[in-house]
Amino acid sequence: MTAKFSPFVQKELKKIYQKDRKLANIIEKQIALFEENPKHPSLRTHKLSGKVSNMWSISITMNIRMAYILLDENIALFIKIGTHDEVYRK
């Protein structure tokens, strides 16, 4: 799976890289794992429901999530990153 990032996610990742290198390293590892196997158990990949039922989510840490949409069967566009509440907010 190829991971792509929306302008919003790119901006947020830049902030994280500047402020929290440890979290940035975790994100890099989780994205690499996602590209290798999007359904790896440690990612806790799941489809969202309700108004965001076209989106999927992976766990970066216990509190940080990244949400994505599938552009096709091999390309995921990450459109949100943040805490559980930030990502799942309507």
Regions found by a protein language model. Give the residues of each.
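Enriched for short, Lys/Arg-rich terminal
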Residues: 2, 11-25, 59-65, 69-90
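A short, compositionally biased N-terminal segment around positions ~18-40 that is enriched
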Residues: 18-39
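Short alpha-helical linear motifs
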Residues: 29, 50-53, 68-71
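A short, surface-exposed loop/turn module that caps and links secondary-structure elements
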Residues: 32-58
